[in-house]
Amino acid sequence: VGSIVASAGLVGLTISLAAQDSAKNLFSGLVILLDRPFSIGDWISVGDVSGEVVDINFRSTKVRALDNSVYILTNSTVSSATVNNGTLRNKRLYRFTLGVTYDTSRPQLEQLMADLTAMLKASPYTYEDSVLVDLSGFGASSMDLLVAAYLRTADMTRFLQMQNDLNL
C-alpha cells in the first residue's frame, strides 16, 4: 500500500510539474490576448526574434521573420520579455554610412554633403527636419559620412521600398 501511495504521489508530482508550464503559457496567453501589446499583422521584436505576428493563441505566438521562417514563441517567454512593437512607430529611421575616398577635396566633400542633404530634404519620403549628413569618422580607406533621416512610414514593407528608392 505504501509503495502505491508513493507511486501515486510521484505521478501526481510529475503531472503537476508538467502542467505548470502549460498553465503558465495559458495564463500568459490570456494576459496577451486581454492586454493586447500586439496584434496579428504587427511587426515585433522579442529577444533575437523579429518579424510579423501571424498567430496568437493561448499557448504561443507565431512570428514570421523577413526570411519567411516562422518562430513559435511560448507566451510565458513573450510575457516575461521586453517586446518592441514596431507597428506602433509613426516613422522609421533610414541610416547608412557612405565612404568617401581620402583624395576627395574639402570643397568636393562639402558639395557632396550639401547635395545629399538637399536630395533627402526634397524627398516626399522624409521628414525634412530629421535629415542629417555629417562627417562621422575616418576609416582605413575612406572618410565616413553618416547619412540619416526619418521616413514617413511605420510599415516595414513600405520602409524597405522607400529605402530602395532613396538608395537608387
Regions found by a protein language model. Give the residues of each.
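Short beta-strand-centered aromatic/proline hotspots
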Residues: 50-56
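Structured, soluble regulatory/oligomerization domains located on the cytosolic or IMS-facing side
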Residues: 46, 60-168
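A structural micro-motif recognizing beta-strand termini
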Residues: 33-36, 101
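Short, glycine/acidic-rich beta->alpha junctions
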Residues: 36, 45, 55
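Membrane-contacting alpha-helices and adjoining membrane-interface segments
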Residues: 1-34, 66-93
